[in-house]
From Swiss-Prot:
Record protein name field: Tryptophan synthase alpha chain
Pfam families per the UniProt record, alphabetical: Trp_syntA
SUPFAM superfamilies xrefs: Ribulose-phoshate binding barrel
Listed GO CC annotations: cytosol
Pathway: Amino-acid biosynthesis; L-tryptophan biosynthesis; L-tryptophan from chorismate: step 5/5
Role summary: The alpha subunit is responsible for the aldol cleavage of indoleglycerol phosphate to indole and glyceraldehyde 3-phosphate.
Gene Ontology MF: a single term: tryptophan synthase activity
InterPro entries (alphabetical): Aldolase_TIM (IPR013785), RibuloseP-bd_barrel (IPR011060), Trp_synthase_alpha_AS (IPR018204), Trp_synthase_suA (IPR002028)
Length: 255
């Protein structure tokens, strides 16, 4: 069992969903990114998704896009992220996932990417713009290092496509709550319950719900049989930090 799955199963055994904050590398700025990540780790994060800044983040809403733009202008890049993770390996209790777009990973080279990610204590990757049909080379490189390539599914993902993902997926399944870009939303979209149920019928892996979560009450809007094993929150956290509040305060809402 991949460590990411272990983290989620342990949280569920304790009677709660696992908590997965998303933090763009270099946000709020280079000086405070790592202390903020450690604060998330110390205050209940089971897994932390680190966003790799990219110039054309097609799946991200304005909050994450702006965080990415600022990080890039501050000189944050994939090579530096991996190097700093290697320097801090073993300090973070949470599972670590890199979430980013294909181009920087492709330019870095899959074999070296997987090796350097393993040296940095990374347990999984999420690549929103990587088609399943083209995922083989990256999946094989990551698998050699014991790193999961986490599948994404959404309202438009067919049962056949889910079955393909289920054959090779590891760690957890990222369930996209709505089609479109990331960002806070007031209510959980009506189709989420259907998507969750369909995914639950196909996958044995834990299901993590993301894209738009703002507060714990949104999970309670879902029927019990459609609630996720883990909650991913990105834009809500970035907005909270941008307003000058602490990661500790944000995590306290979800406990």
């Amino acid at each position: 069992m991949n460590l990411l799955e272990e983290k989620i199963r342990a949280a569920n055994a304790a009677g709660r969903p696992a908590l997965i904050p998303f933090l763009t590398a270099g946000f709020p700025d280079r000086a405070t990114f790592w202390p903020t990540l450690m604060e998330l780790d110390e205050n209940g994060a089971d897994i932390i998704e680190i966003g790799v800044p990219f110039s054309d983040p097609v799946a991200d809403g304005p909050v994450v896009e702006e965080a990415s733009r600022r990080a890039l202008s501050d000189g944050v890049n994939l090579r530096g992220i991996l190097a700093e993770l290697a320097q801090r390996k073993g300090l973070v209790k949470a599972g670590l996932v890199l979430m980013g777009y294909l181009n920087p990973f492709l330019q870095y080279g899959y074999e070296k990417l997987a090796q350097d990610a393993a040296r940095g204590g990374v347990h999984g990757f999420i690549v929103p713009d990587l088609p399943h049909e083209e995922s083989g080379p990256l999946h094989r490189a990551l698998k050699k290092e014991g790193i999961a390539l986490i599948p994404l599914v959404g309202p438009n993902t067919s049962a056949e496509r889910m079955a393909l993902y289920a054959e090779e997926g590891e760690g957890y399944v990222y369930v996209v709550s709505v089609m479109g870009i990331t960002g806070e939303r007031g209510d959980v979209a009506p189709q989420v319950a259907d998507t969750m149920r369909r995914a639950r019928s196909v996958f044995s892996l834990p299901l993590a719900l993301g894209f738009g979560l703002r507060e714990p009450g949104q999970l309670r809007e879902l029927p019990p049989d459609a609630r996720p094993d883990a909650a991913v929150f990105g834009s809500a956290l970035l907005n909270h930090l941008e307003e000058g509040h602490s990661a500790e305060e944000f995590m306290a809402r979800w406990k």
